[in-house]
Swiss-Prot record:
Stored PANTHER family: ATP-DEPENDENT CLP PROTEASE PROTEOLYTIC SUBUNIT
Protein name in UniProt: ATP-dependent Clp protease proteolytic subunit
Domain of life: Bacteria
Annotated keywords: Cytoplasm, Hydrolase, Protease, Serine protease
Cross-referenced NCBIfam families: clpP, PRK00277.1, PRK12553.1
Matching Gene3D superfamilies: 2-enoyl-CoA Hydratase, Chain A, domain 1
Organism: Listeria monocytogenes serovar 1/2a (strain ATCC BAA-679 / EGD-e)
Encoding gene (name): clpP
Length: 198
């Protein structure tokens, strides 16, 4: 059961009811609080594009509590974060794992944060293949290309050498917020909104 709270605002023209996500969007806040699939990605991408069209000079705040999910859906979000003119500040909370950690690290330079008790997990892309040997070989080559591309991006965003990223993502690698900061996945640990930029 998915209950979405409603917020009532009083204005000079009367009352207005918003679902909580629409109200947060007014403050340029986007929540990624689930596994990443095409539907979630389409929603996040739409919100990024809307906020950028509204004011490309004001930062967007993407809060992430996600176990990860689809690589192609996550890459759609990643590409849109880079496509929009507005800086996207990322804030990790709870667990940012797999594609969730990738998106956390993809925030604007100097504007990637985690709350003190957030956990961040990086690993290599997961994929499954079945069918004839040739089909399995094609799928394996494809996942290796994706792994190389994602490791290259992570190396650029963290400042870690590619070889270190490749080694450290070989298996599930869990980090505290402080370890993620030391590694370069985030820029700072914040305890309240005053730690955000802008």
């Amino acid at each position: 059961m998915n209950l979405i709270p409603t917020v009532i605002e009083q204005t000079s023209r009367g009352e207005r009811a918003y679902d909580i996500y629409s109200r947060l969007l007014k403050d340029r806040i986007i929540m990624l609080g689930s596994a990443i699939d095409d539907n979630v990605a389409n929603s996040i991408v739409s919100q990024l594009l809307f906020l950028d069209a509204q004011d490309p000079e004001k930062d967007i705040f993407l809060y992430i509590n996600s176990p990860g999910g689809s690589i192609s859906a996550g890459m759609a979000i990643y590409d849109t974060m880079n496509f929009v003119k507005a800086d996207v500040q990322t804030i990790g909370m709870g667990m940012a794992a797999s594609m969730g950690s990738f998106l956390l690290t993809a925030g604007a330079n100097g504007k990637r944060f985690a709350l003190p008790n957030a956990e961040i997990m990086i690993h290599q892309p997961l994929g499954g293949a079945q069918g004839q040997a040739t089909e399995i070989e094609i799928a394996a080559r494809h996942i290796l290309k994706i792994k190389e591309r994602m490791n290259t991006i992570m190396a650029e965003k963290t400042g870690q050498p590619y070889e270190v990223i490749a080694r450290d993502t070989d298996r599930d690698n869990f980090m505290t917020a402080q370890e993620a900061k030391d590694y370069g996945l985030i820029d700072d640990i914040i305890i309240n909104k005053s730690g955000l930029k802008g």
